[in-house]
């Protein structure tokens, strides 16, 4: 593991394996960064959050709570992943997007713009949630489905 630049690891946080933390990134609390994961830029990983595998958290992104980001997932821009949210596979969460609650974003799904995915919602396969769209409750958005604009999906399947 490497921690360099102005990066900081504090509290009971731990960085190990081939993980990299650099730039002005902050890893603290009980957070773990491991495997080949990278945390860089001004990103923060804190609370009990896990970032592992080949995941990349960068820019001004924040991953917190009991959330985890793994696989080849990327969280960047001003994106927030918090509570118990999970981002994995080749998923991307970026822009000002938020993923929270017990929500999951996986496979090659993308959540971006000012979109919000929360509750027990799942966004997976090649699905996209963008603009100011909200996906929540027990909603599942999958396949090549796109939810955008000011749309709200609070239950059921879209795929």
Feature map (PLM): residue ranges:
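Thr-biased low-complexity repeat/linker tracts and other Thr-enriched repetitive architectures
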Residues: 1-150
């Amino acid at each position: 593991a490497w921690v360099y630049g102005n990066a900081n690891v504090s509290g009971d946080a731990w960085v190990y394996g081939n993980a990299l933390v650099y730039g002005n990134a902050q890893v603290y609390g009980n957070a773990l960064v491991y495997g080949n994961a990278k945390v860089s830029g001004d990103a923060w990983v804190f609370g009990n959050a896990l970032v592992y595998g080949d995941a990349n958290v960068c820019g001004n992104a924040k991953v917190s709570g009991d959330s985890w980001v793994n696989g080849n997932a990327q969280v960047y821009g001003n994106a927030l992943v918090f509570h118990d949210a999970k981002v994995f596979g080749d998923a991307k969460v970026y822009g000002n997007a938020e993923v929270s609650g017990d929500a999951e974003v996986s496979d090659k799904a993308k959540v971006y713009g000012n979109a919000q995915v929360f509750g027990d919602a799942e966004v997976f396969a090649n699905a996209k949630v963008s603009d100011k769209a909200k996906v929540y409750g027990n909603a599942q958005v999958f396949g090549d489905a796109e939810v955008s604009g000011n749309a709200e999906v609070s239950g059921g399947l879209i795929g």
